[in-house]
C-alpha cells in the first residue's frame, strides 16, 4: 500500500484471563493480519479485567447530561477508543452472551448510542467459545458498535475447548487474517 501513515489500533479484551485467554489469541491474530497489510501500526491492548469498570446504575445521567457520574476507569478507556483509528473488541461467550466485563463496559457507553462519537472508526468483533453462541455475541457486538457510530468491518469466531486449539483452525486463521486486512483497508 502506498499510504504509510501510522494506524492506531486498540484491541480490547473482555476476558478475565487476560493474556492467557483465547480471546487475546484471536485479537493477536487479527493484529497480525493488519500488520501484514500495513506495517505502520501502533497497537495497544486493553484488558478490561485490569480496570475498574463499575456496572451501570441506570441513572441515565449520560443521556441527560452527556457524562457518567461514576468515578472509575471508563472515561479513560473511552478516550483511548476515541484516539484509535480501529478497534478490535473481543469477548468470550458466557451463557450465549458477552462476558460480564464486556457487558458492564458497553452498558456504561450508553450515552454514545444517543450521541454517536465513533463515525470514521472501524471495528472488528471477536467471540471465543467452546462451540456455541459466537454468532450471537458477534451479532450483539456489531449492533452495539454500530449504534456508537462505528462501522463494523469484520467478525471472528474461534471455538476451542483447549486454549489455542481451535476446532475450526483453518477457518479461524483465514478469518483473523482477513479481518485484520479489512480493518486496515477501511481505515486507509
Map each language-model feature to its residues.
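N-terminal beta1-alpha1-beta2 submodule of the flavodoxin-like/Rossmannoid cofactor-binding fold
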Residues: 1-91, 96-111, 174-179, 184, ...
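Short histidine/acidic/glycine/proline-rich micro-motifs that form metal-
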Residues: 16-20, 95, 129-132, 161-163
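Conserved short-loop catalytic and cofactor-binding motifs
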Residues: 65, 90-93, 125, 129, ...
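A short secondary-structure junction signal
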Residues: 100, 134-139, 167-171
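Conserved helix-turn-beta segment immediately C-terminal to the redox Cys motif
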Residues: 112-116
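Short, glycine-/small-residue-rich phosphate/pyrophosphate-handling segment
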Residues: 117-158
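Active-site/pore-lining binding-face segments in mid-to-C-terminal subdomains
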Residues: 143-188
Amino acid at each position: 500500500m502506498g499510504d504509510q501513515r501510522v494506524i492506531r489500533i486498540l484491541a480490547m479484551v473482555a476476558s478475565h484471563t487476560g493474556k492467557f485467554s483465547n480471546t487475546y489469541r484471536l485479537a493477536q491474530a487479527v493484529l497480525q493480519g493488519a500488520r501484514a497489510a500495513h506495517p505502520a501500526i501502533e497497537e495497544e491492548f486493553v484488558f478490561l479485567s485490569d480496570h475498574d469498570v463499575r456496572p451501570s446504575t441506570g441513572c441515565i445521567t449520560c443521556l441527560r447530561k452527556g457524562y457518567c457520574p461514576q468515578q472509575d476507569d471508563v472515561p479513560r478507556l473511552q478516550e483511548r477508543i476515541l484516539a484509535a483509528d480501529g478497534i478490535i473488541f473481543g469477548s468470550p461467550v458466557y451463557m450465549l452472551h458477552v462476558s460480564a466485563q464486556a457487558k458492564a463496559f458497553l452498558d456504561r457507553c450508553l450515552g454514545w448510542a444517543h450521541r454517536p462519537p465513533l463515525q470514521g472508526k472501524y471495528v472488528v468483533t471477536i467471540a471465543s467459545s467452546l462451540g456455541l453462541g459466537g454468532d450471537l455475541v458477534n451479532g450483539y457486538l456489531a449492533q452495539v458498535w454500530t449504534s456508537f457510530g462505528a462501522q463494523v468491518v469484520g467478525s471472528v469466531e474461534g471455538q476451542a475447548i483447549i486454549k489455542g486449539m481451535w476446532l475450526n483452525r483453518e477457518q479461524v486463521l483465514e478469518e483473523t487474517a482477513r479481518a485484520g486486512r479489512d480493518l486496515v483497508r477501511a481505515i486507509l
